[in-house]
């Protein structure tokens, strides 16, 4: 490297260091080439040409995913000994003194984007209308009467889905397709940018859209990890619950069998001591007592029983007989 090149490189590095000291929040997008400074809710992009400081830097305002060029102060002549930090301050001064300048520029960008969006919608509507005009109803069936004209089918209007708002929380940000700051780079600088992975990543992540996508990815990964921690124990819990369910089912079946046995025993006892059975038993007992008392009388008349024994047995049987007859009368009351 020649002495003039070394001198230019030394001046360039000194200018960059002064810029970083003056603006502590400077983001180095591409090493020693492209820088981004947060400024009034936007970003001021500084692109250094290959032959800097012999050639002036290029300034851009990063507004709504676009890069708006900013000219150097009027009547300002850039020289090799010009101070990059001071020029950057001069670039910022008009916007700081009068915030309406930046607001006007933002409104212009919004109007431009709105017009582009409107043009795209109009083109889409035209394409839809052309598709409707080209539509024709199918021919009538052959067996349809000739004198009856087929009703002309009205084409159904194509319903367009409402476009999501640009600032919708669920809308995925668009990756920028144009990189104006790369146009001022030489082939050597571009090759160096491609070879240096850190510089390339810094340049890519300097775009808010890429950063937002990266943040969304990190949030989704964190959410997946959280859900994984919740769902991983679920199979074991399900197996345990299934085992408990089977045990409870077996216990239930055993209890059902016992309940059926007890129910059968209950029905048997209920049938045995039902009113009908009790009445039949009572009638049989009354009949037996009456028959036994008659037999005692016959035995006494035939001389087989003494008077004293006859009185005792006959009285006992008749007392039981009348007692059960009384119970039978009470049963029907």
UniProtKB/Swiss-Prot annotation:
Region annotation Disordered: where it falls in the sequence: 116-176
GO CC annotation terms, alphabetical: ESCRT I complex; late endosome membrane
A Pfam family recorded for this sequence: Mod_r
One GO term (biological process): protein targeting to vacuole
Biological role stated in the UniProt entry: Component of the ESCRT-I complex, a regulator of vesicular trafficking process.
Membership in a protein family: Belongs to the VPS37 family.
Subunit structure comment from the entry: Component of the ESCRT-I complex (endosomal sorting complex required for transport I).
Name of the protein in its database record: Vacuolar protein sorting-associated protein 37
Organism: Dictyostelium discoideum
Organism classification: Eukaryota, Amoebozoa, Evosea, Eumycetozoa, Dictyostelia
